[in-house]
């Protein structure tokens, strides 16, 4: 198969993965309206073409939290990444490191902090949920700090798990789920050998380290389900802010008032995100939410954005709408599932190329030049 775009990686991943894994990463909440709008709204944003501007000296380099990034992209935290390729978190982190961008390790990764951090040269980021088990949270923070993680990404849009109906149909959950997953794996021998067998252990490494025993997929569902905390408030984050002395980013902001609260709290950054359409269906796409949030807090903290970003054009669009940097989630997991770490490297190079074309034809010589002036006026006013 010829790979020429991010969509090609999605198609390749669908062929290679057992359905329960493909649909877990590909699906969203409820009827998946927000999942679709994330992609569609971004694709409908018209860039303003400018020509004859001598674009020979063009740079994608940017700075964020005292780190230099080769382009304004980081890999987002994605749970179970190690189920999509053999020791998938390590492979993805190495690809990000090679490209000169941050990798964010999920709380519910297969590979633990202690396995991923030594595999790369630059400090990785670590993502954490607010959970009832505060002992686990403190343990994870201590281990992240000891491993040299530079930035904490705190996910706040999961006080309860989203209703992901596709998971019940695919075998990730629902009746006879374990048997259905086993039967699917039989018909995907490449994955079964390369990941299912050679990629062991399939523990949720960060949780296993804390509990002192292996945890499999069923444990993941049960332990997390009992630990989500709907009582969380900004006050619950205060001890974390005091404990963590590095940059702290609040992930899951969709409203300008919440963004202002993050500034008052003392966050270093926010991620404008609807969790990739996986939590509450019917909320605004990140692209639609971003401009008002940028108007409210631009300059007070770093603004990151995710959800719906599939290519370099989408990165430029998000930056023009007010983001400083974007996070890639599904896009890199598709590439990882299709072709391992090399697939992620190829995807990042493709995004780099797509960004350069878009910047050249919008007259933006640097990342700081990408702003609302790069958008068609009607789009700026009526997104």
Swiss-Prot record:
Enzyme class, broadest EC rank: oxidoreductase
Residues annotated to bind FMN: 106, 127, 155, 251, 306-330
Chief location category: membrane
Needed co-factor(s): FMN
The UniProt record lists the keyword Cell membrane: yes
Keyword Oxidoreductase belongs to the record: yes
Function of the protein: Catalyzes the conversion of L-lactate to pyruvate. Is coupled to the respiratory chain.
Name the record gives this protein: L-lactate dehydrogenase
Organism of provenance: Acinetobacter baumannii (strain ATCC 17978 / DSM 105126 / CIP 53.77 / LMG 1025 / NCDC KC755 / 5377)
Name of the coding gene: lldD
């Amino acid at each position: 198969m010829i790979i020429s775009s991010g969509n090609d990686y999605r198609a390749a991943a669908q062929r290679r993965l057992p359905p329960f894994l493909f649909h877990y990463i590909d699906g969203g909440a409820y009827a998946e309206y927000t999942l679709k709008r994330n992609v569609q709204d971004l694709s409908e944003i018209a860039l303003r073409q400018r020509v004859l501007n001598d674009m020979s000296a063009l740079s994608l380099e940017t700075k964020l939290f005292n780190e230099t990034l080769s382009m304004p992209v980081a890999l987002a935290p994605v749970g179970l990444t190690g189920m999509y390729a053999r020791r998938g978190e390590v492979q993805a982190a190495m690809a990000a490191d090679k490209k000169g961008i941050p990798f964010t390790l999920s709380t519910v990764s297969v590979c633990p902090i202690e396995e991923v951090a030594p595999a790369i040269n630059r400090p990785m980021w670590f993502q954490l949920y607010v959970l009832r088990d505060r002992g686990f949270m403190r343990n994870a923070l201590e281990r992240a700090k000891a491993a040299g993680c530079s930035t904490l990404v705190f996910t706040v849009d999961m006080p309860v798990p989203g209703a992901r109906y596709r998971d019940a149909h695919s075998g990730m959950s629902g009746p006879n789920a374990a048997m259905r997953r086993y039967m699917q794996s039989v018909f995907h021998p490449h994955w079964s050998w390369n990941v299912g067998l050679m990629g062991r252990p399939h523990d949720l490494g960060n949780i296993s380290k804390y509990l002192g025993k292996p945890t499999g997929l069923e444990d993941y569902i049960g332990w997390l389900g009992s630990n989500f905390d709907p009582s969380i408030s900004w006050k619950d984050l205060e001890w974390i802010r005091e404990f963590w002395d590095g940059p702290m980013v609040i992930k899951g902001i969709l409203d300008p008032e919440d963004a202002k609260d993050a500034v008052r709290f003392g966050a270093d950054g926010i991620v404008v995100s609807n969790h990739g359409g996986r939590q509450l269906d019917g909320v605004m796409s990140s692209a639609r939410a971003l401009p008002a949030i940028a108007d409210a807090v631009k300059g007070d903290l770093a603004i990151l954005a995710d959800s719906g970003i599939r290519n370099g054009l989408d990165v430029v669009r998000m930056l023009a709408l007010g983001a400083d940097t974007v996070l890639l989630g599904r896009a890199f997991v598709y590439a990882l599932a299709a072709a391992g770490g090399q697939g992620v490297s190829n995807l990042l190079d493709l995004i780099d190329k797509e960004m350069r074309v878009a910047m050249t034809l919008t007259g933006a010589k640097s990342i700081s030049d990408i702003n609302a002036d790069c958008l068609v006026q009607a789009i700026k006013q009526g997104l």
